[in-house]
Amino acid sequence: MNTQLINNQWQAGQGPAFASINPSNGETIWQGNGASAEQVNSAIKAARAAQLQWADTPLEQRITILENFAAQLKEHSEEFAVIIAQETGKPLWETRTEVGAMTGKVAISVKAYNERTGTTENPMPGAKAFIRHKPHGVVAIFGPYNFPGHLPNGHIVPAILAGNTVVFKPSELTPHVAQFTLSLWLKAGLPAGVINLVQGEIETGKALAAHQDIDGLFFTGSSNTGHLLHKQFAGHPGKILALEMGGNNPLIIKDVNDVSAAVHDIIQSGFITSGQRCTCARRVFIENSSNGDAILAKLISATKNIVVDDSFATEQPFMGAMISEKAALGMVAAQNELVAKGAEVLVELKQLKPGTGFVSPGIIDVTNVNDMPDEEHFGPLIKIYRYSDFDSAINEANNTSFGLSAGLLADSENDYNHFLKRIRAGIVNWNRPITGASSAAPFGGIGASGNHRASAYYAADYCAYPVASVESDKVTLPQTLAPGLIIE
């Protein structure tokens, strides 16, 4: 199978064979060979050869091609949603929203480019001052598996818009989505070499990240991989590195009158996408009060009733399969480890079908666990903390090396204002699920969740660098020379 796109030419990979498995049924839906180091090098060379001409292409023409891409997404939206569902196990209703987000990214990126990295002009005595922005050059983009279309798209669209060329390395778990995405870019009329695709596993990624001729790398994925990339780039200050990693995200509930609404937002925060969003609530803090008891009781009941089923079930489920059986078994193991530390299972997370990624959502009370690991358990397992003091709950919420998302469900605006001042996270929501983030706002975290390169609306910032200029249309001798200077 031709799995690599280099200089607008599809070709077979020359590296190790790998396959993509539908986590809902264990069937192989894609197979091919990864890119060799030589093919990675060829992709970077193609991107380098195309970069200057692409940067010189008028902005209006670049925008037209991006709009063509958005039109292709609309035209093929259902086919694309089906491919994402097959490869990730997510319900079809959710993958349809992912394709919609990809389509909307184009207009948002154009707006962000003009607002944040366009050209500004200011008068000054005898000259004009300009601020312009230039592309970095050739950038590598690493994509994750949980949103294999939308999240890499959030790097690719603004990077190409700014005049960069791209070498894209998707997750080895979602190669079919990547291949389909690139086919739409070709249909949109993107010139040869502007975007290149190198598929493969860890060796392909290493060859791309270590290549001397990339000018930057944009990454969305696990904290462990992000930290390795950060160390690797530490000796290369001339290369731009944008990291969007995970989180051990807290959600605090305090004095909420509408118990059902609170339970809804907890479930949306913890279990959407089978808990495989980097913004999902991992830790939920519930008051030691009658209100807290009522919320927890209803949460337990509602969690037991969550429908988990195939992506294409006629009656659509809330949760589909996790990305793989390995991921599902990893969540079962994480739950067992917490039980061994003294946690109490309130709703057991179980693998529902051997050979698949299907698990039931779980709730576990960790209030009495003294040595809680600061880990992102990337799946549908909510850890409950009961608290009596609001400030102590906030302090414990901040007791993490991560800092991606956080939220408060509370009827009091004063409580929220206090929470907002004290909590450490890049995304902070009030009375909304903490998985809710807008593409028209920055998306990023602090601490182990990123390196201060927020994506989404602020992706424009890391896709181009500023150039400051003072300009005059002719050389002019000042009427008054500086002291000690004589020009005759």
Swiss-Prot record:
Listed Pfam families: Aldedh
Catalytic reactions of this protein: N-succinyl-L-glutamate 5-semialdehyde + NAD(+) + H2O = N-succinyl-L-glutamate + NADH + 2 H(+)
Name recorded for this polypeptide: N-succinylglutamate 5-semialdehyde dehydrogenase 2
Function of the protein: Catalyzes the NAD-dependent reduction of succinylglutamate semialdehyde into succinylglutamate.
Family: Belongs to the aldehyde dehydrogenase family. AstD subfamily.
InterPro entries, A to Z: Ald_DH/histidinol_DH (IPR016161), Ald_DH_C (IPR016163), Ald_DH_CS_CYS (IPR016160), Ald_DH_CS_GLU (IPR029510), Ald_DH_N (IPR016162), Aldehyde_DH_dom (IPR015590), SuccinylGlu_semiald_DH_AstD (IPR017649)
E.C. code: 1.2.1.71
Superkingdom: Bacteria
Catalytic residues (UniProt): 244, 278
A biological process term (GO) from this entry: arginine catabolic process to glutamate
List of residues binding NAD(+): 221-226
Organism placement in taxonomy: Bacteria, Pseudomonadati, Pseudomonadota, Gammaproteobacteria, Alteromonadales
GO terms assigned for molecular function: succinylglutamate-semialdehyde dehydrogenase activity
Protein keywords: Arginine metabolism, NAD, Oxidoreductase
Keyword Glycoprotein in annotation: no
Pathway assigned in UniProt: Amino-acid degradation; L-arginine degradation via AST pathway; L-glutamate and succinate from L-arginine: step 4/5
